[in-house]
């Protein structure tokens, strides 16, 4: 039992720790009440003479001081383990009765105020000084000359903010002058972090001033402190590529300063001038901060510059941490070939550079993008062979790699079900191991299960997983919501709905086949897991029983098993609209005729003002596009409405062979760039003939109030109304790109619709002349053109128009690299009809590779 000593030294009383802490607590409470009463009286008297306002920050500061004092006092009492030899031993003290406790407490609490050596404010102040000595050196505290700034920004070490302290020192008189630079820089490097850019500049200026501008004395700790703060910054949104980035420029400036210091030191040594000084050294930590910020900017040029600079000039090669950062950069930039080369370098460079589990997880993520399941299995075997402990994310990534690889029969080598079964077994193994789970691992685990279920076409399990995850997230947000839940439903649903979960659910609808048996139904553990999720999924009620005020509903059909194509189409439409309308809090996709007319009148006036204010067509077009973007953000949940989810949503009627539904979805949710530009041009030319709207009654929105230079016919008015409605509907549309044109061509192949194929051929030809296509990289443009040409060949082959298919191949043989896999179906069809001449021409194109062309491609690859 811990002992504590209370009372005067000449009369020592020993109490158990709990009782002594009780005494201290009561004494503190009494003193605190007395102090508050005294301070209240003083404040009341002082308020009569002058207006003194106590801010909430001051109250919080005083309370923080009091809490700190209480913690310090508790620690002191706890650390008192024994008393002096003249005092009583703990084992010889009899337990104190309740009456004795009450008497002693009364005596202690009745000590006269004049005998108290210190009041509560003095104790708090002494505790504050003791705490502050551990945070900042005494000289810094004196030059800041404001304890409030230090306390408010530094007391909570988990959320310390050094920027106000550095800025206060910057405006002080002495700054860092007359301070020992060595000891000070050691403290500075390990303490001052997460400064904004302007405070970093202030700190750098004060450090240079401290050493009188002698860059030779700018030591390693100073460099590490500055680079560490620079590396933690985030690039601005408008400068993501690192071009002329102020942080990159500052890093290069510091490296130039270091080079200058090395040069000056070498000259002094050669001339034997002054005392020999220690040359600062560049470190791996500095290189890592340079690479960390370069990867944030997605700047390959700057990253290569820093690696080359440190290797050639300073003899510092990238370590494991540096190389891992580089691999993560390659992964984000889709530079998979460079990532694999760097990964192989790490494995064979040395044992110090051997990849850790973080690097392996990054490579597994690349395997998922490449759908390379054999390589992923090899990586997992390497992890086990080298006794590297897998993390939760390792098993999740293995499941996701196998799920994505099973999506294609060619990639999966005809073993799609086996890959999905293996993916589930990795998740079972993860559950059995009970590894540490990060807060994001639950989301990743749900996404992995959704991927396996979606690619398997298991709609029942996908619906259950989607419902359980969204319900859990929604209820968690509502439980922790600080505002009005009923009023803030729009914000809550926007934070709840996730595009990845929606995309996997749409994929499950697209792969619907009532004849297929889910993979999990083939073994006992899978049956138990699937039954567990289905049992928790309530497809009919969907009401939170714990709080009747919070209603959670998803628009699933009130049936547990979807068994028809009509049900799948209906539920997919309902879920899609529910997500786009932000949980049903908006009414964007469905509007009455009256609401449509109101929108037309509203935007007719708005477009009129844009046309009158714009100096030229480009400015008018910019204003309209900005307004469309604004409309979309206000009326649609843009977090879930993207090209990936739309592509999956449009593929549902294609796989279910529902042509009418596909065309409806395509028309309602997409628009084409050339059509948009034609509408904008017509509106601009029409509005430029209308007088300024200032001469018109602002309150009237009828068509009679609009005067034009020439009479408008009914046909003209209908065209204007149609164009305005076209602009209004863009809030729930996405512009067609090369991927969507390819999807439409796949639909034409599936439906054998020649008119649709001709239309998409012409529309894509017009799209190739627009700015979005021309801005694409040339290699990407060629690859996209080749993919579309391949689809056209497939269409003509299925139509039996073999001469047209061969004509496309011959006309593009010098532009595209036609392989046998691209013309396999055409070759088989020609063999069936025994067209030997066409077969010979086709194989000649596929097999013919001129030596000059091969050298040209090799040269381009080397230049890249």
UniProtKB/Swiss-Prot annotation:
Major localization listed first in the record, in broad terms: mitochondrion
Q: Which InterPro entries match?
A: Pentatricopeptide_rpt, TPR-like_helical_dom_sf
One BP term from GO: mRNA processing
Q: Does the keyword Mitochondrion apply?
A: yes
Entry's PROSITE patterns? PPR
Chain positions of PPR repeats: 319-353, 356-390
| Places the protein is found | Mitochondrion
Q: Which GO terms describe its cellular component?
A: mitochondrion
Arranged from A to Z, the UniProt key words for this protein are:
Mitochondrion, mRNA processing, mRNA splicing, Repeat, Transit peptide
Transit peptide endpoints, chain numbering: 1-76
Q: Which Gene3D superfamilies match?
A: Tetratricopeptide repeat domain
Q: How does it assemble?
A: Binds to mitochondrial small subunit 15S rRNA.
Alphabetical list of NCBIfam families matching this protein: PPR
Q: What else is known?
A: Involved in mitochondrial-nuclear incompatibility, a major determinant in reproductive isolation between species, through hybrid incompatibility of Ccm1 and its interacting partner 15S rRNA between yeast species.
- Matches recorded under PANTHER family: PENTATRICOPEPTIDE REPEAT-CONTAINING PROTEIN GUN1, CHLOROPLASTIC, PPR_LONG DOMAIN-CONTAINING PROTEIN
Protein task:
Regulates mitochondrial small subunit maturation by controlling 15S rRNA 5'-end processing. Localizes to the 5' precursor of the 15S rRNA in a position that is subsequently occupied by mS47 in the mature yeast mtSSU. Uses structure and sequence-specific RNA recognition, binding to a single-stranded region of the precursor and specifically recognizing bases -6 to -1. The exchange of Ccm1 for mS47 is coupled to the irreversible removal of precursor rRNA that is accompanied by conformational changes of the mitoribosomal proteins uS5m and mS26.
**Recorded family membership:** Belongs to the CCM1 family.
**Protein name from the UniProt record:** Mitochondrial 15S rRNA processing factor CCM1
The UniProt gene name for this protein comes to CCM1
């Amino acid at each position: 039992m811990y002992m504590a000593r209370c009372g005067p030294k000449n009369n020592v009383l020993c109490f158990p720790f709990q009782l002594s802490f009780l005494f201290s607590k009561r004494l503190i409470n009494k003193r605190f009440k007395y102090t508050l009463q005294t301070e209240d009286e003083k404040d009341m008297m002082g308020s009569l003479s002058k207006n003194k306002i106590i801010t909430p920050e001051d109250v919080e500061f005083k309370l923080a001081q009091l809490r700190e004092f209480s913690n310090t006092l508790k620690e002191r009492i706890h650390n008192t383990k024994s008393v002096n030899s003249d005092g009583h031993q703990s084992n010889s003290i009899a337990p104190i009765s309740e009456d004795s406790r009450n008497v002693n407490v009364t005596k202690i609490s009745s000590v006269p105020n004049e005998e108290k050596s210190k009041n509560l404010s003095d104790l708090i102040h002494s505790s504050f000084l003791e705490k502050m000595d551990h945070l900042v050196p005494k000289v810094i505290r004196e030059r800041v000359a404001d304890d409030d700034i230090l306390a408010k920004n530094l007391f909570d070490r988990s959320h310390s903010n050094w920027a106000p302290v550095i800025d206060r020192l910057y405006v002080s008189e002495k700054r860092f002058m007359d301070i020992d630079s060595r000891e000070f820089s050691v403290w500075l490097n390990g303490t001052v972090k997460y400064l904004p850019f302007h405070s970093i500049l202030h700190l750098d200026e004060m450090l240079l001033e401290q050493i009188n501008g002698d860059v030779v004395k700018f030591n390693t700790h100073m460099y590490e402190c500055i680079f560490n703060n620079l590396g933690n910054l985030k690039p601005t949104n408008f400068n993501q590529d690192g071009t002329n980035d102020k942080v990159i420029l500052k890093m290069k400036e510091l490296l130039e300063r270091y080079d200058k210091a090395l040069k000056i030191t070498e000259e002094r040594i050669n001339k034997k001038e002054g005392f020999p000084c220690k040359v600062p050294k560049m470190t791996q930590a500095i290189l890592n901060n340079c690479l960390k910020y370069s990867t944030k900017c997605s700047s390959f040029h700057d990253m290569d510059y820093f690696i080359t600079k440190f290797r050639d000039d300073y003899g510092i090669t990238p370590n494991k941490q540096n190389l891992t950062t580089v691999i993560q950069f390659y992964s984000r930039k889709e530079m998979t070939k460079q990532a694999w080369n760097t990964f192989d370098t790490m494995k064979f460079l040395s044992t110090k550079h051997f990849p850790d589990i973080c690097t392996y997880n990054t490579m597994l993520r690349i395997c998922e993008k490449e759908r390379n399941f054999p390589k992923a299995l090899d990586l997992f075997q390497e992890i086990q062979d080298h006794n590297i402990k897998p993390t939760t994310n390792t098993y999740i990534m293995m499941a996701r790699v196998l799920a994505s690889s099973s999506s294609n029969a060619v990639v999966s080598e005809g073993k799609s079900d086996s890959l999905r079964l293996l993916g589930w077994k990795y998740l079972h193994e993860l559950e059995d191991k009970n590894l540490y789970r990060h807060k994001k691992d639950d989301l990743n685990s749900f996404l992995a299960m959704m991927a396996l279920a979606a690619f398997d076409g298991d709609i029942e399990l996908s619906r259950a997983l989607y419902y359980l995850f969204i319900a859990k997230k929604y209820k968690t947000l509502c439980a922790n919501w600080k505002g009005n839940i009923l009023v803030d439903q729009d914000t809550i649903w926007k934070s709840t709905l996730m595009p990845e979960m929606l995309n996997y659910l749409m994929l499950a609808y697209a792969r619907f086949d009532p004849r297929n048996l889910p993979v999990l139904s083939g073994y006992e553990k899978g049956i138990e897991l699937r039954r567990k999720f289905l049992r928790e999924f309530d497809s009919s009620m969907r009401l939170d029983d714990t709080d009747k005020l919070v209603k959670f509903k998803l628009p699933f059909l009130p049936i547990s098993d979807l068994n028809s194509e009509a049900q799948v189409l209906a539920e997919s439409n309902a879920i899609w609209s529910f997500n786009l309308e932000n949980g049903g809090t908006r009414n964007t996709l469905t509007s009455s005729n009256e609401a449509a007319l109101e929108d037309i009148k509203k935007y007719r006036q708005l477009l009129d003002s844009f046309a009158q204010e714009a100096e030229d067509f480009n400015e008018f077009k910019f204003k309209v596009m900005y307004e469309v973007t604004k409309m979309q953000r206000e009326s649609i949940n843009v977090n879930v409405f993207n090209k990936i989810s739309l592509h999956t949503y449009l593929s549902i009627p294609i796989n279910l062979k529902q042509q009418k539904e596909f065309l409806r979805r395509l028309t309602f949710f997409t628009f084409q760039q050339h059509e948009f530009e034609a509408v904008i041009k017509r509106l601009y030319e029409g509005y430029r003939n209308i007088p300024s709207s200032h001469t018109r009654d602002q309150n009237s929105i009828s068509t009679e109030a609009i005067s034009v230079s020439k009479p408008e016919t009914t046909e003209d008015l209908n065209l204007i109304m149609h164009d305005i409605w076209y602009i209004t509907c863009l809030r729930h549309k996405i512009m067609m790109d090369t991927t969507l044109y390819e999807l439409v061509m796949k639909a034409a192949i599936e439906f054998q619709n020649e008119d649709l194929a001709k239309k998409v051929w012409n529309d894509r030809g017009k799209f190739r002349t627009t700015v979005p296509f021309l801005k694409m990289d040339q290699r990407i443009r060629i690859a996209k053109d080749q993919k579309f040409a391949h689809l056209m060949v497939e269409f003509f082959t299925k139509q039996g128009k073999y001469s047209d298919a061969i004509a496309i191949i011959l006309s593009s043989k010098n532009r595209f690299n036609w392989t046998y896999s691209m013309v396999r179906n055409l070759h088989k069809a020609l063999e069936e009809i025994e067209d030997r001449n066409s077969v010979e021409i086709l194989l000649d194109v596929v097999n013919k590779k001129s030596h000059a062309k091969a050298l040209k491609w090799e040269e381009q690859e080397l230049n890249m």
